[in-house]
Every structure is written in C-alpha cells, then in structure tokens.
Amino acid sequence: MSDVKHDSAAQEFYVELPEGKALLHYEREGEKLNFHHTFVPPELRGKGLAEEVVKAGFEFADQNKLKVIPSCPYVARLVMKNPEWKRLIVHS
C-alpha cells in the first residue's frame, strides 16, 4: 500500500510517486464531502492507486462524522464493491 496523504487546503487525498500524482479531489459542503474527481497518471493505472486514495477519503469522512456525495463515477462504482461505505453516502 502506498502512503496516502491529505491536503485539506487543496481538498485532495493523494499518492505522490516519481511517475506522477494519483488523487481524489473533493469539495467540502458543510458536513458533506463531494468526491467529484479521481485521477491516476496513465503509466500508473491498474495498480490500485485510485482505490487507495478513495479508501483514505472514506476513512477520513467516517472518522470525522462526515457524509460523502459520490459524484465521481469511479467512486460510485467502488461504493457498489464496498457496501460498508454505503452508510456514509448521501446524494447532494
């Protein structure tokens, strides 16, 4: 597992590697986090990095009693594969 960092000023969870930065970008909306964009550099795709940053985002939301709006299609698909996250989901 890579070292996922949280930059609250930039509103992102990310993994920094020599090949680039894998990230989950969000917007804070009161007591909700809108997970609206994930990105992994092409040469790093298929290694589970997007899932790692999304998992870190859900753990942060859970620990801080926040809800998640899964606007990013990738995040929405991951919720289907991780039913334990469904309790954190709200829709705008």
How would you name each of these model-derived features?
Residues T38-R45:
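A short, internal acetyl-CoA/4′-phosphopantetheine-binding micro-motif in the GNAT/acyltransferase core
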